[in-house]
Amino acid sequence: MTSLMFKEACSSSEVVAAQLKAEGARYAELGAALRAKPPQTVLTIARGSSDHAAAYVAYLIMARLGRIVASLPMSLVTLLNAPLHADNALAIAISQSGQSPDVIEPIRYFRKGGATTVAMVNDATSPLAQSAQWCMPLHAGAELSVAATKSYIASLAAGAQLAGHWENDANFLAALADLPEALAAATELDWSEAIDVLTPANNIMVVGRGISYPVALEAALKLKETSVIQAEAFSGAEIKHGPMALIDNGYPLMIFATRGPSQAGLIHLAEEMRGRGARVLLAAPADVAERNLTIPVAGTPDLDPIVAIQAFYMMAAKLSLARGLNPDKPRHLSKVTKTN
């Protein structure tokens, strides 16, 4: 059996290529507008996988543009009616469906208050798309599996487009143009070792740091959704502040060690946790001898997390089936979630 989750994840390369072609000029226009009037405040508005994509976007904006970004607790608007000042703010909403009130209402609130509002959304006819000043379609197409894959990767690519065009960095944008090729390569990798380790597992820690932490969050969510594994994501800087007390002999630990300043520390953490008895699955590029799982590299380290999660999705879809589950229809879940 080949799941819809697997098939949809495999199409991410084509999805990103379509988005780059269709929306590049629009992102260039948005980037020019942000350079002409730089926002004092940047907020992200999202739930679930989209919030993990928002964390990646926040990292890019802070690291590359020096703008402080915060994730909005949506209940401040939807439940508490807090008097938030929106003038000269940039509010970025990310959503697959564009249907959830707790994402729509803050965008409407901030737009009314004078903020620049951007909706990265798969359904360009949705209420969220209609509520934002800038609707930036993800071009992921219909996603039938409950587990979001191609729409998440499309959200990461959209965030990279926003940051790249805002910074107006030709080298970064050139690397982004080559991203579909790297995504295609990620679908061909052998992560069977992870399936062998996780098929009998009940729990796991998923670790990243810096630019790779958002995909650790996403991987942990997918392991919960599709394989019913109690998965928790941690920054490599936080795992020693309590969580490693859980480590005992054979405890699974997946570490995303993509290129960049955090990589050396994550490789060292993998070795330390092996010494404590953990069953470590170190996902890293081919030049890291200590790796268990290989991830391809993109044109720049800041895009590596996108190809890393693509490789993970291929494995996760197979793992769910190996555990006797249906990754397309996780129990208790539905494709569109509406919360206030």
In which residue ranges do the predicted regions lie?
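Alpha-helix N-cap/helix-start motif at coil-to-helix transitions, marked by capping-box chemistry
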Residues: 7-10, 126, 309
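Generic C-terminus detector
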Residues: 299-340
